[in-house]
């Protein structure tokens, strides 16, 4: 089974939560966006959150559940 990947990234002044190339939420802070992504990822295991920094590089990765790739 593949991991479901949720992305957290900045866009202008907002922070976006994305999954399957769809914006799920636009939030005022990184903290809020990570919380929303974490809730969705916990409910959609196995999953991961990739948090992008201002340059677009992955700054942090969080995983939820166990999958065949572990």
Annotate each predicted stretch with a short phrase.
Residues 27-45:
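A short, charged, amphipathic alpha-helix used as a generic interaction element across diverse proteins
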Residues 20-22, 29, 63:
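Surface loops and adjacent helix of pleckstrin homology
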Residues 1-23:
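Short aromatic-glycine-(Arg/Gly/Cys) micro-motifs in beta-strand/loop hairpins
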Residues 4, 57-70:
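A cross-kingdom feature marking charged/low-complexity
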Residues 46-53:
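A short amphipathic beta-strand at an alpha->beta junction
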Residues 24-27, 57-59:
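Surface-exposed loop/edge segments in extracytoplasmic proteins
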Residues 16, 25, 50, 62, ...:
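Intrinsically disordered, low-complexity regions of eukaryotic proteins
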Residues 10-11, 22, 53, 67-70:
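Eukaryotic scaffold repeat domains enriched in small/polar residues
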């Amino acid at each position: 089974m593949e991991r479901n990947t949720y992305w957290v990234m900045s866009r202008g002044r907002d922070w976006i939560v994305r999954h399957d190339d769809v914006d799920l939420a636009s939030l005022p802070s990184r903290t809020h966006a990570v919380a929303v992504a974490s809730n969705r990822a916990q409910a959609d295991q196995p999953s991961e959150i990739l948090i992008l920094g201002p340059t677009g590089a992955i700054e942090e990765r969080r995983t939820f559940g166990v999958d065949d790739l572990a």
